[in-house]
Every structure is written in C-alpha cells, then in structure tokens.
C-alpha cells in the first residue's frame, strides 16, 4: 500500500545522472561509478550512505528533520528501554498533536551484529559530507536548505530529553543499572554547502531515501480526507462501517507501526468489530 515519495525535482535530473529510490536500491552494485547524493537521513538514508562510502563512493547526504537515537543505552538495546518505560504504549490521548506525531520521521536505527550506533557523526567520520534538506534542482545545481545546524541541534535536544526520561525511570526502578554514556553532539560543518553542481562535483547518481506515501489506488471507497489520506479514528474507518486499518503510524499507540505493536491494535479492533456485528452490522 506504499509507494516511494520522490520530490518533483527528481524528474528534472539530467539523463546521465542515475535516479534510484531506496526501495529499488539493494547494494552499491546498483549505483554507477562516481559520487552519490543521498537525500534523506532516516534509517535507510544513513545505511545507504554508509554502504556507499564503504564501497569507495564520495557521498553527500542531504539532511532534513530526523530522529536521532542510539542503538544501545545503559547496557541494553534502546527498544528495550522504550518498551520498559512505557513510551511505546503511549496512546492517542497521551499526545498533544496527533497529526505531528504521525508525521515524525522514523528513528535513525540500524540493526547490525555488533549493535553499533549509526548516526551522522559516524558518517562524517567515514568521509560523508553533510548538507541541509534537499530544496530543489535547477540548471544543473542541487539546492539545499540552510537549516542543517538547526535540525541537528533539535534532534540532539530531543535525544537528550529521551535519554533523561530513561535515566529518571531507571533511578526509580533499577538504580543499580550501569551509568549511561551520552552520545556526543552532532558534528555539523561550519559552512555546509547550499548548492552543488552535480556535473562539476562528479555526482553520477542520486538515491532518494525520502520515505513512502500511501498508495490506495486499489481502494474504491469514499474514505479519504482532502489530502488523500485514509480517514480513520484509531483504525476504525468511520465513513465505511466494517472497514478497518492496521499497521499505520501511531494508529492507536506509538508502537502501532512495529510488528510487535500490531497485536494490541488488532485486539482492540477485533473487539470493535465484534461489537458492531453483534449490533447488527
């Protein structure tokens, strides 16, 4: 039900610059020789940038709003603490702005055998150049926002708050846990480039790690809002009784889009469906 969300500017790239979505990318072998511009700095963008840099490609990463998160903290996987502290169980009534929460980028989390943290600092240490959010492409030039320092500072601030909440929970419930080591602030270049001429920079391909948009072309029902999104209340599609949704971001809980979070949502919606059927639905 999802399709890659690609900026309109992608259609203006010259024919000699490969345009690849994160969905189609499988390995560095999919990318021609030369420099690569990776657009998007959530988990997929970071992982692709790291792989390409490791394969010898000069890599530039366009960074917009992102959620920074370490793979491990205080001796355990960060997902363990999110579960233990109840953060993943937060529901619709626990957030002030549901629309904003549903549009927050996915965390910068990548699974590896050594459970190492892959973040912007790890990428710059590998030679990846950071620039701001991709803003467009005109006359051979890729353009970038000047907000890189601000978005990185905000991501660092939110990470500090999250780790502080975990520390407070541990102080109360398990004070003997080993102390936590906070990640260093994001190392932002002093003057990140705002424009790059792809030809002069030797950039031969662009990888769009810009997320996905819902594709409901198969669903012939009047159940969408003015932006084309499925209109529902906690997975209950009000405009079409008997129709339900599962797996959407923060459908009913913060964990709704995780495999381990779908079961609780499914139980709630099954209860709603059963009641509707008993009432004559």
Regions found by a protein language model. Name each.
Residues 1-281:
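Flavin (primarily FAD) cofactor-binding/catalytic cores of flavoenzymes
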